[in-house]
Design a protein with these regions (language model features):
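A conserved regulatory-domain signal marking ACT and ACT-like small-molecule sensing domains
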Residues: 1-95
Length: 95
């Protein structure tokens, strides 16, 4: 049986640029959790200044998640005022 892409389950590597202020991580992780996206690891890589705003680079690696759940979560994350950009969304293949 061939699955639709929304039914495929995989891990994801996400790289986001967000405002470097309290509550941003809670907003993002709350959205992911509400869409059944479990976080395997998360790290703040660096801070930078964009148009005089202090920004942070966040890298998240998820546990296995359905493609559709990830798409739905990212659609909500895109609406956050604290989001600068979603730099990467990469499927991670298991070994």
């Amino acid at each position: 049986e061939i699955l639709s892409i929304g039914q495929v389950s995989t891990k994801y590597y996400l790289r986001l640029i967000v405002k470097d202020k309290p509550g941003v991580m809670a907003s993002i992780t709350g959205i992911l959790g509400n869409h059944q996206v479990s976080i395997g690891s998360m790290i703040q890589k660096r801070t930078l200044t964009v148009n005089e705003d202090k920004m942070a680079e966040i890298v998240i690696v998820t546990h296995q998640v359905l493609e559709q759940d990830m798409r739905d979560a990212l659609a909500v994350v895109k609406g956050l005022s604290c989001l600068g950009s979603i730099e990467n969304v990469i499927r991670v293949e298991e070994e």
